[in-house]
Amino acid sequence: MTYQTAIDAVRELKA
């Protein structure tokens, strides 16, 4: 799991 995956997940939660 890369940091990009974590960022994507956070963006989904904030969306």
UniProtKB/Swiss-Prot annotation:
Regulation: Inhibited by hydroxymalonate, oxalate and itaconate.
Keywords: Cobalt, Glyoxylate bypass, Iron, Lyase, Magnesium, Manganese, Tricarboxylic acid cycle
Keyword Transport: no
EC number: 4.1.3.1
Molecular function via GO: isocitrate lyase activity
GO biological process: glyoxylate cycle; tricarboxylic acid cycle
Listed pathway(s): Carbohydrate metabolism; glyoxylate cycle; (S)-malate from isocitrate: step 1/2
Keyword Disulfide bond: no
pH dependence: Optimum pH is 7.5.
Cofactor(s) for this UniProt protein: Mg(2+)
Cofactor note: Divalent metal cations. Mn(2+), Fe(2+) or Co(2+) can be used.
Catalytic activity: D-threo-isocitrate = glyoxylate + succinate
Domain of life assignment: Bacteria
Function: Involved in the metabolic adaptation in response to environmental changes. Catalyzes the reversible formation of succinate and glyoxylate from isocitrate, a key step of the glyoxylate cycle, which operates as an anaplerotic route for replenishing the tricarboxylic acid cycle during growth on fatty acid substrates.
Subunit structure: Homotetramer.
Family: Belongs to the isocitrate lyase/PEP mutase superfamily. Isocitrate lyase family.
Name of protein: Isocitrate lyase
Source organism (scientific name): Acinetobacter calcoaceticus
Lineage: Bacteria, Pseudomonadati, Pseudomonadota, Gammaproteobacteria, Moraxellales
